[in-house]
Curated annotation (Swiss-Prot):
It comes from Pyrococcus abyssi (strain GE5 / Orsay). The gene is rps9. One of its GO terms (molecular function) is RNA binding. PROSITE patterns: RIBOSOMAL_S9 (PS00360). PANTHER family: RIBOSOMAL PROTEIN S16 (PTHR21569:SF16), RIBOSOMAL PROTEIN S9 (PTHR21569). This is Small ribosomal subunit protein uS9. SUPFAM superfamilies: Ribosomal protein S5 domain 2-like (SSF54211). Residues 108-118 have a biased composition (Basic and acidic residues). Keywords: Ribonucleoprotein, Ribosomal protein.
Length: 135
């Protein structure tokens, strides 16, 4: 039995996906993906599976464990982990090209992070300045 483990990161969320032969079950933190709320996060997670097609989707079981970040960061981290797992599972370069053509961040990841707050007025944000008055 073949088992593949992959990871995906987005902002501060980290997802670990385990893919194995199965019947098309997808679980996020132990719950079926159908129960993931809000709906936009669920569709984000399912994007790579829809692009891969029913044939691949119904031949594997995917378990994803996600921690850190907010709900959308977690959904995008899970999406990256699932896409990488499917590419590694199939070994198909056409699938990899399809993912990259659809959305490059599905495989590559997004390096943007939040900017750290700077001293003085740091509660307002990293670049906030005191308003200057000339009169």
């Amino acid at each position: 039995m073949r088992i593949i483990q992959t990871t995906g990161k987005r902002k501060t969320a980290i997802a670990r996906a385990v893919i194995r032969e199965g019947k098309g079950r997808v679980r996020i933190n132990g719950k079926p993906v159908e129960l993931v709320e809000p709906e936009i996060a669920r569709f984000t997670i399912l994007e790579p599976l829809i692009l891969a097609g029913e044939e691949i989707w119904n031949s594997v079981d995917i378990d994803v464990k996600v921690q850190g970040g907010g709900f959308m960061g977690q959904a995008e981290a899970a999406r990256i982990a699932i896409a990488r797992a499917l590419v590694e599972w199939t070994g198909d370069m056409n699938l990899k090209e399809k993912f990259i053509k659809y959305d490059r961040t599905m495989l590559v990841g997004d390096p943007r992070r939040t900017e750290p707050h700077k001293p003085n007025r740091s509660t307002k944000g990293p670049r906030a300045k005191r308003q200057k008055s000339y009169r």
